[in-house]
Amino acid sequence: MANRFLRPNLIHRFSTVSPVGPPTTIIPEILSFDQPKPEVDLDLSDQARLFASVPISTLLRSTAILHATSIGPMVDLGSWLMSSKLMDTTVTRDLVLRIVKGTFYDHFCAGEDAAAAARRVSSVYESTGLKGMLVYGVEHAEDGGACDENIQKFIETVEAAKTLPSSHLSSVVVKITAICPMNVLKRVSDLLRWQYKNPNFKLPWKLNSFPVFSGLSPLYHTTSEPEPLTVEEERELEKAHERLKSVCLRCQESNVPLLIDAEDTILQPAIDYMAYWSAIMFNSDKDRPIVYNTIQAYLKDAGERLHLALRESEKMNVPIGFKLVRGAYMSSEAKLADSLGYKSPVHDTIQNTHDCYNDCMSFLMEKASNGSGIAVILATHNTDSGKLGARKASELGINKENGKIEFAQLYGMSDALSFGLKRAGFNVSKYMPYGPVDTAIPYLIRRAYENRGMMSTGALDRQLMRKELKRRVMAW
């Protein structure tokens, strides 16, 4: 049986989708490729070519910082210190933040305000040809007052983006958790899950959106029927929609794409719901969607949800953008599921995650290449996925310059992959968070843990940077 939403040059096995209520599994199983992949210029071994544009001072700092974050005990000590009560002491806090700012913060973040971040975007593009994704680095808001403050920062981000040439900037990023109170997002997610279990359950506040669940979606967070939203909760949700609408309008007027970041599964249904609502509202240009949602491929239901959302967008003739990532909340997902007596919603093995990412990537690239209103940002630090994506683009004859396909990595990480993809002719961006140093601490701790160990994401960069430094020293 064939599925028109899966890429045609693969063979898949899956079951059907029920038109009412929770669908059954449609996750594809890749059996074989029927076409050889053409060679593509994505050589990540020649450090002299990859890092030719990087000043020696930057190479020295980057090598030192990535080496420091590869030392497990150092990462553990630094994480403990930045999360400890010692940070409540003014002298200690000021000292730690000064050290962090001159090292890890400057390596992984773009600046303390929107103007500084825009300048960093320009300098990165002018020296390397890599674009920037601007994001205000606040993550969670507990009340409406904090949300009102945060939306002003996101609007400032759009205003800063408008000062940059379009060639320098890929997009701006918004976090729904920063513009809608966390308790409201959790309540909305609970109610959406309960409606998925019981389709006759009414949600009078619900607006038009795409599907946010599939047959594999984790529903264990909501074990009993939730109470309806209170009047105050409905008011807060309406305000959140207005905040999101305000930033979407500015992005639409400026023709600046807006990426909506993902969170963990306890909140993600509400985020997907709001993301798809805004896509329906603001994605009117078939060639350049404004709103992008994020799909986390480490979730077992990622493939199903992607196909269902795209199916509905095609029915409604609404273009859509997706940012595809692997995911960043593995530990918290596993702990929460275990505490409730359920299996983790994350794939059981890293290979399953790789397979899911690569399958979703290939499917999205095919959709984007056939003239449909799809745009894709392939966010990955995995070199195998980068090489596969480059080969797939060559196989499909994708126009690398039209913006329908783009690669991305975090600022300060996977530079070898970024430079290699850029040399191969692709649009490549760096995710560049900004904000006060103290607000960036949770983000920096996550980056440190990603880079720890000899087999970490930063291992290839460290190896190639050291070789390039040695080459330059020997050439003197």
UniProtKB/Swiss-Prot annotation:
It is found in: Mitochondrion. Keywords: FAD, Flavoprotein, Mitochondrion, Oxidoreductase, Proline metabolism, Stress response, Transit peptide. Its EC number is 1.5.5.2. Coiled coil: none annotated. Expressed in the vascular tissue and in the abscission zone of petals, sepals, stamina, pistils and siliques. Not detected in petioles. GO terms for biological process: proline catabolic process; proline catabolic process to glutamate; response to osmotic stress; response to water deprivation. Induction: Down-regulated by high succrose; via the repression of bZIP11. Up-regulated by proline and salt or drought stress. Disruption phenotype: No visible phenotype when grown under normal conditions. No proline hypersensitivity. Residues 1-29 form a transit peptide. GO terms for cellular component: mitochondrion. InterPro entries: FAD-linked_oxidoreductase-like, Proline_DH_dom, Proline_oxidase. Its main location: mitochondrion. One of its GO terms (molecular function) is proline dehydrogenase activity. Pathway: Amino-acid degradation; L-proline degradation into L-glutamate; L-glutamate from L-proline: step 1/2. Its cofactor is FAD. PANTHER family: PROLINE DEHYDROGENASE 2, MITOCHONDRIAL, PROLINE OXIDASE. Converts proline to delta-1-pyrroline-5-carboxylate. Belongs to the proline oxidase family. This is Proline dehydrogenase 2, mitochondrial. It comes from Arabidopsis thaliana (Mouse-ear cress).
